[in-house]
Structures are given as structure tokens and as C-alpha cells.
Amino acid sequence: MEKELWKGNEAIAEAAIRAGCDCFFGYPITPQSEVPEYMSAHLPKAGGVFLQSESEVAAINMVYGAAGAGMRAMTSSSSPGISLKQEGITYIAGAELPCVIVNCMRGGPGLGTIQPGQGDYYQATRGGGNGYYRTLVLSPSNVQEAVDFVQEAFDIADQIGRASCRERV
């Protein structure tokens, strides 16, 4: 297999397209702005839908709607944006809908810094919103793992979503 050299965020976006992502809803925020930038240029060419939302809150609620309609939906953000998305994430978790959320973490509390960090791991694994729910978190240690985990994330989300739909019938 031929090796390719990619920037991490662009590799994640390309992996999502190759994984069959139908739609991406996002809002630019450092350090993940390359993800929506790449998706805007390449997802429509693959037959998908890209929409830059007016806010992080709008983006996660668009994912909620798309996932509810059976689409392979994805969004991305970084720490402050993920915090803004928490209410929408609780709705998605409560409805047991499949989606992929990429968090390009950055350091510090509040708005923090623009350097990478891992402070959001606790929020992601323990639920940042109200209610009793957990989200499945895949935490890559390098770009190759990030690419592999994107495909895995879509596959797991589909399995969980289909299973929860069968349970409700």
C-alpha cells in the first residue's frame, strides 16, 4: 500500500468522505478549521452535503436532524465549540441516533489557547450535558489512528443506531 502524507485535520475529513459521510455541518474554530474547509471543497464532489452553520449550536442540531433522517452525519469542533454543542449532544444521545463528532481539543479552561490539548477527554467520556448518558469516545494517538477511527466511528454509530431502533419497535 502506498503511503500518503496528510495534515491531520484534512486526513480526518478525507477519511469521513471515504467512510460514506452523507453530510457535514460545522462552524470554523481553531484548531479544527481545516476539517470544514476540506469538507466544503470535497464532500459535495462525492455527492454529500456540506453546510457551514451560523453557530456551533446550529451545527449540532443540524446533525441531530440529519441523523434522525437516517443520514451518516458528522460535525467537528474544538473545546469551546464542543461545550456549546452539549445540549444538542444530549438530545442525540437521548434519541440514540448515530453520528460522528470530531473534537480537535485545545488547552485551557474557557476559551483557552489555540494549542492542542487533552482537557476535553473527561467531558467527552462522562457526558458534558444534563442527564445520564455516555458517549463512545475513540481517542487516537496519531494521524493514522485518527483516519482508522473515523471509519470505525461511522460503523459503530450505525450499529448502535440500528440496534436502538430495533429495540424501540
Spans of features found by a protein language model:
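Short, structured patches in soluble enzyme cores that scaffold and shape functional sites
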Residues: N103, S139-N142, R168
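Flexible, glycine/proline-enriched loop segments at strand-loop-helix junctions
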Residues: L111, Y133-E145
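Phosphate/diphosphate-binding loops
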Residues: S141-N142, A157, G161
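A general structural signal for short secondary-structure junctions and capping/turn motifs
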Residues: Y91-I92, D155-Q159
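Residue-level detector of conserved catalytic or cofactor/ligand-binding positions
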Residues: Q159-V169
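Thiamine diphosphate
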Residues: M1-G127, R134, Q151
